């Protein structure tokens, strides 16, 4: 997450009932296509609905930016989550952080009625 993304209102934070942060997501890009970047849910909060809320809020934000698709370079352990959200697997793509590592790349169609 970059300071410019925070200033632009593109960073979303999920909190628990005590208002403690349990997850974060960042939408980066421009009209047409955006990336769901840096989405993370604290392991104890997995299964609480925080990930779904972050994903759905990211979809709303991306649509507000005028995007018609959102790409997601996912952690392999999170791949089933993105598939449940309706994202479509495209291919394996190089990791931005770890040279030589391939990660599943997904696409979410923002023109559909899902996750609105």
Which residues make up each language-model segment?
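A generic "binding-loop/recognition-motif" signal
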Residues: 32, 77-78
């Amino acid at each position: 997450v970059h300071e410019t993304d925070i200033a632009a209102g593109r960073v979303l934070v999920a909190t628990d009932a005590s208002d403690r942060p349990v997850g974060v997501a960042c939408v980066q890009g421009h009209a047409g296509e955006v990336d769901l970047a840096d989405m993370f849910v604290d392991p104890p909060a997995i299964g609480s609905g925080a990930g779904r809320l972050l994903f759905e809020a990211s979809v709303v934000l991306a649509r507000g930016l005028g995007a018609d698709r959102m790409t997601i370079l996912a952690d392999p352990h999170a791949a089933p989550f993105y598939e449940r959200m309706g994202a479509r697997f495209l291919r394996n793509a190089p990791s931005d952080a770890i040279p030589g590592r391939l990660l599943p790349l997904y696409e979410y169609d923002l023109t559909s009625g899902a996750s609105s």
